[in-house]
């Protein structure tokens, strides 16, 4: 009986992995990086609906997950693949991108539409340490809050300053701060291998001076454009 249950679990896990792969079948890491850069540019170009400049400038890392999809076979019903970039040790410039998978959470599908883009700002070292772990859950392993919207919006409330991660989503053109409690993030080792030709960990990529691919360099250039530190 135990063996039968184990076989069932393994089979179910295989179906989930296969189905998740089918959602992104044929899409390369380079194409997804380009889409991530487009998402950032479109959001920041909105006159009164972008992420406040002050927050982006203060952030330690950013997670961009374009096109999160509804997926009934995933626990939590939602699945996405995206990238993390963190500031270099000097505090200026951005690292090569590391790949992540996102599952569960509430990404704004109530607004309508079949896909949602998400952006997460990691605001302090504690949040970065959580981000570099093998897996963590927003709201449980790291404090999270809906980020303020508007290029000149105030970022000085206690809630925003205490949160380790500020989160946003965009669906059907509507961009808003939304608390993504319950969403889990984990490394996407397959995509990292595709980009860099070896099985590097996210920590090695973000903290080890890994050279970015061409598409990764373009995303970093966009981040520098919108979040250059002046100090």
Region spans (language model):
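Bacterial N-terminal signal peptides that target proteins for export
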Residues: 1-13
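Sec/Tat signal peptide C-region and signal peptidase I cleavage site
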Residues: 18-25
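Small-residue-enriched, tightly packed secondary-structure blocks
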Residues: 26-231
